[in-house]
Structure formats: structure tokens, C-alpha cells
């Protein structure tokens, strides 16, 4: 959150929150604080975060109750209880906000909550009337900052003053240009080193609309800019300063140019019309932080599964090596036969032959115990490969293209389901096969009804796509009715696809689409053509003792499918509403 965005948020919050009585404090995570304030228009929540990647102060929708037992939340609950927010101050171009609390409006401030939004140096301080630190979000020790160490009980000192000068509407264009050209550096460096409040995002916005791409123009030395460039930049500079002075803010998003060297993805000044900033900004942070959390959790789960697969492959190879040694039993028997076929074998030769026979018998008997262990490790490898395939298939869906809160919540639910299944699988991998007498941990009861991907074919038939092992079993064995068709990529981990042909006769286009979806949601999705099995659901059978989502089939036929064709179709498809669960056949 840069200075311009902070000014826009505070201009919107002051009439809503001043005055407002403090009621609740909670800390949902280690870097975020949420305050409940009751004003004239009702209860409102303020979120303050000192996360280095996304420090922010803004109003949010009522959050769930969580984190009210943290130390910082308890101190704030005790220190601000019975007080009202009477002022919100922010001076100059500093990203420091003072929230003043007093027993009632018009009285002297008894407590101050100071919010510093400065990247990795962001922090939150609760101060008493004398300016001493009662509590703070994170301690700043001398090893971290010799200039400004702060701890509970010490006197609060403001951050060091900014070295550059504050922008001013009274400055002339000639003086402004001369200052920027004083040192032969790039335009970006000149703006940020000469004036306060110029963030990288604001620098991009100031040069937006020039003939050259914004990033290229900012990288040019100031001495090479033309008069046209300076006139355009001066006009944008004046518009920015006027909007700041008059608190004329709005919200605009330009997704087409984000991350491509153009302006930042959103702006809150220079917009076509004025409007609220806080609500869309809160949604923006919610989406970006949610996507980051999804990517981190997905990467962590992938590392766990890969480590478990490597360990399981090593154990399987050990059993395979033991099984390969069984073939040497025949050689041992022949060596023993050769010793006993001597004309006059000695006692030592007879003893050696008997030892060779015993070794050969032990090797042959070991097949009975090695083979089940080898099969067990192979089943575990297949399960791990399937889990990795699910994670890879739905990774792009979990990480990108989430433009609405519903999309983000759905992605979180799908990832959580994969995490729960993987935890059970990893626990089973760590216990099965070590001791025959040890039992695997019981499977946890599912918390809710599975929610597979549901789509409508061009012919109006429903098609269900399992996105984890539990969903695969649910659509293939529990929800399937006589007449439904099951699709799965041949000899390849992936999703079960069920075409609900029991409702109506499936056209050729519907059958081809279901096959394409099965190819797309498989590990062979990058191939040009994929063989897909098409089997009537009444020919599916659960494998006794196997894990969820493991089936065998009789008959069926192979259909050639195109994963790319399914990908193009999915881009325009819409999910159908959920329907009540139907009893299995």
C-alpha cells in the first residue's frame, strides 16, 4: 500500500469511523490485526497488517471469530476497552497513521495506535498517554536496528524523516524539471530520489499514456527525454497533486497491462469518476493473498508427496533386488549338484553342497513374503502418482484465473480436500509394510459431500469430473446409475469422468467431449492424442481392500481423445448447479 492508496483509504474511512467505539480486537494470523469499531452507521471492522509483502490498513467485511486469544489482541482488548476512536491522523507523505482513542469525543487522547506501513519495517504500536509503548506487533532489537530499537516499555520515536522533498503544487514546471535533471540517472530514480511519496507503482502511473511503454520510459536517462515527454509527465504530476489535495479518488483496474511493463494493476487517482476505494481494494488484497496462500500450500504438498514417493520407490527397489536374487537359487543348486557329482567328494565339499542347497531353498521360500511387499509398495506408488497427478492437473486452476471470491473459496476447498487425502495417504505409507502386526491409522470421516466438477455437454447431459480420490469413488460407484458411462485415460493416473447418459441418450459429440475431458484431466494432458477407456458404469467394480477411487472394469472400448480440444471447451463452459445426491445403483 503506497502513500496515494493510503490517503484514498483514510479519506473514505474518516467519515465512517470517527467517532466509533472500540469493541473487539482479534489476530487471525501472526501478521494481521482486526479491530471491531461501532459507529453511528453500525459495526465496522478495520484490518491492519504488517506483512512485509502486503502491509495495509483498510475496512473489511465482518470476519469470522478467530485469534482473540493472542497476546496482542488481549492487550488491545484491555487497553482500548471503553474508549472511542476520535481521530485518524496521517502527516505529509509519511506512511504512518495515528489512531487516537479517548473516553469520548472532544476529550484528550488516552491511547494511540500507531500503524507504520513501510514494507519489511512495518509495525503496529499501542502507546499510552505519555507516548510509551504498551505493546507492539513485533519487537525491534538493537541487532535489527541500531538507529531505532523499540520494545515494550520504551518511549516511541517516529521513523527517520524522509531525505527527499515533499511535492508541492506551488512549484513551477521549470524548477520541477531542473530538479529532476540535476543528476544523470534514469527517470524512475530521479522521481523516487527527488520527491517523497513516489512508489514504483505511482511512477508507472505518472508516465502512463506516453507513446512509449511506461517501463521503457522510466528506464531512460532524464537527459534523453523530449519536450513532449516532459509536458506529458508534468500534466500527470499536476493531476496527481490536485487529486491528493482535494481527496478526489476513485478505482480503476487494468488487467490487460498488469505485469507487462505498463501501469500497476489498479489505481485510485486520475480516474474518470470518483468513487469508493476501500471495498475494491480489500477484494484486491483478498484475491492476491489468497492466490499466494494457494501456491504456497500447493508447493508444500507437492514436496511432501515427492519425498514420500522417493522413499517408497527406494523401498520397492529393495524388495525388487531381493526378488531378483531368487533367480540365483538355481545357480546355487547347480553348484551343489556339481559338488555332489564328484567321484569322491570330501566331507567339506558335502557340507558346502548342503549349505548351497539351504541357501537356494531360503531364496525360493522368500518369494512368498517378498511378492506381497512388492505389490504393496507398487500400490502405494500408484496412489502417490495419482495424488501428484491431481495436484498437477488442478494446479493451474488453483493458482490462476481466480477473479471472484467464489472461485477462490472453491479452489481452497479443492486444495484442502487434496491435503486431507494426502495426509491419510502419507500416514498409510509410513505405517503399512513395516510390521505385519501394525495396523494403518483409520481413515478420518469425510466432513462434507464431495463436490466434483460438474459441466453440461452441448447435448444438455451432465458430466462429472473427479478432482481427488474421494470424488472419483463418489461419482463412479455411489452416484452412478445404470446407463451412465465411465471414462478414464488408459494406463495413466487421472480423473474419473462420468457422463450421465442415464438421463437421455448421449450423442456422439457428448461422448467425444467426455473422452476429451478424461484425457485433459490426466497425466497425459500434454499429448496430442490420448487413448481413453469408455466403460458402462454397471461394469465397474470396487477392488476389495483397495483405497478409495480404485476400481476395476470388465469390457469397455478405447476412444481416442484430444486434451487440447477439452481445454478450449472448458474455457467457455459454465458449471451447473449442484444437485442432491442420488443413491447408487
Residue ranges of model-derived segments:
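Extended, highly charged segments
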Residues: 1-585
Amino acid at each position: 500500500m503506497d502513500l496515494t492508496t493510503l490517503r484514498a483509504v483514510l479519506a473514505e474511512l474518516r467519515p465512517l469511523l470517527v467517532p466509533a467505539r472500540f469493541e473487539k480486537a482479534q489476530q487471525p494470523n501472526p501478521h494481521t490485526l482486526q479491530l471491531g469499531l461501532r459507529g453511528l452507521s453500525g459495526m465496522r471492522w478495520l484490518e491492519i497488517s504488517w506483512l512485509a509483502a502486503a502491509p495495509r490498513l483498510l475496512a473489511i467485511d465482518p470476519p469470522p471469530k478467530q485469534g482473540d486469544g493472542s497476546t496482542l489482541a488481549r492487550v488491545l482488548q484491555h487497553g482500548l476497552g471503553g474508549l472511542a476512536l476520535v481521530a485518524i491522523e496521517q502527516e505529509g507523505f509519511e506512511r504512518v497513521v495515528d489512531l487516537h482513542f479517548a473516553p469520548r469525543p472532544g476529550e484528550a487522547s488516552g491511547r494511540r495506535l500507531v500503524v507504520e506501513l513501510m514494507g519489511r519495517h512495518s509495525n503496529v504500536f499501542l502507546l499510552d498517554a505519555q507516548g510509551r509503548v504498551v505493546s507492539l506487533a513485533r519487537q525491534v532489537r538493537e541487532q535489527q536496528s541500531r538507529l531505532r530499537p523499540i520494545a515494550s516499555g520504551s518511549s516511541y520515536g517516529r521513523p527517520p524523516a524522509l531525505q527527499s522533498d515533499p511535492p508541492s503544487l506551488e512549484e513551477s514546471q521549470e524548477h520541477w524539471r531542473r530538479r529532476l535533471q540535476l543528476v544523470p540517472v534514469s527517470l524512475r530514480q530521479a522521481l523516487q530520489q527527488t520527491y517523497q511519496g513516489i512508489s514504483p507503482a505511482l511512477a508507472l502511473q505518472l508516465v502512463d499514456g506516453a507513446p512509449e511503454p511506461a517501463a521503457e520510459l522510466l528506464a531512460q536517462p532524464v537527459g534523453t527525454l523530449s519536450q513532449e515527454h516532459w509536458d506529458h509527465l508534468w500534466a500527470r504530476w499536476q493531476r496527481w497533486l490536485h487529486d491528493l489535495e482535494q481527496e478526489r479518488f476513485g478505482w480503476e483496474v487494468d488487467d490487460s497491462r498488469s505485469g507487462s511493463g505498463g501501469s500497476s494493476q489498479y489505481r485510485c487517482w486520475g480516474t474518470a469518476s470518483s468513487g469508493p476505494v476501500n471495498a475494491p481494494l480489500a477484494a484486491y488484497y483478498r484475491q492476491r493473498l489468497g492466490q499466494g496462500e494457494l501456491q504456497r500450500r500447493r508447493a508444500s504438498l507437492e514436496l511432501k508427496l515427492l519425498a514420500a514417493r522417493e522413499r517408497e520407490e527406494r523401498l520397492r527397489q529393495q524388495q525388487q533386488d531381493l526378488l531378483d536374487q531368487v533367480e540365483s537359487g538355481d545357480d546355487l543348486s547347480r553348484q551343489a549338484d556339481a559338488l555332489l557329482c564328484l567321484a569322491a567328494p570330501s566331507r567339506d565339499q558335502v557340507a558346502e553342497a548342503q549349505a548351497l542347497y539351504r541357501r537356494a531353498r531360503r531364496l525360493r521360500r522368500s518369494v512368498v513374503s517378498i511378492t506381497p511387499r512388492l505389490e504393496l509398495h507398487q500400490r502405494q506408488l500408484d496412489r502417490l502418482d495419482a495424488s501428484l497427478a491431481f495436484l498437477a492437473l488442478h494446479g493451474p486452476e488453483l493458482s490462476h484465473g481466480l477473479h471472484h471470491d467464489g472461485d477462490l473459496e472453491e479452489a481452497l476447498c479443492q486444495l484442502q480436500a487434496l491435503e486431507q487425502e494426502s495426509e491419510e495417504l502419507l500416514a498409510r505409507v509410513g505405517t503399512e509394510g513395516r510390521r505385519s502386526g501394525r495396523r494403518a491409522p483409520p481413515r478420518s470421516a469425510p466432513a462434507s459431500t464431495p463436490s466434483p466438477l460438474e459441466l453440461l455437454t452441448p447435448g444438455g447431459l451432465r458430466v462429472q469430473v473427479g478432482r481427488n480420490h474421494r470424488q472419483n469413488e463418489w461419482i463412479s460407484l455411489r452416484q452412478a446409475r445404470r446407463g451412465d458411462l465411465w471414462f478414464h485415460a488408459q494406463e495413466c493416473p487421472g480423473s474419473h469422468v462420468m457422463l450421465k447418459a442415464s438421463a437421455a441418450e448421449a450423442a456422439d459429440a457428448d461422448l467425444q467431449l467426455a473422452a476429451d475431458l478424461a484425457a485433459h484431466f490426466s497425466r497425459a494432458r500434454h499429448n496430442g492424442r490420448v487413448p481413453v477407456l469408455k466403460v458402462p458404469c454397471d461394469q465397474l467394480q470396487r477392488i476389495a481392500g483397495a483405497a478409495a477411487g480404485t476400481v476395476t472394469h470388465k469390457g469397455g472400448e478405447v476412444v481416442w481423445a484430444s486434451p487440447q480440444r477439452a481445454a478450449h471447451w472448458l474455457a467457455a463452459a459454465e458449471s451447473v448447479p449442484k444437485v442432491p445426491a442420488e443413491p447408487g445403483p
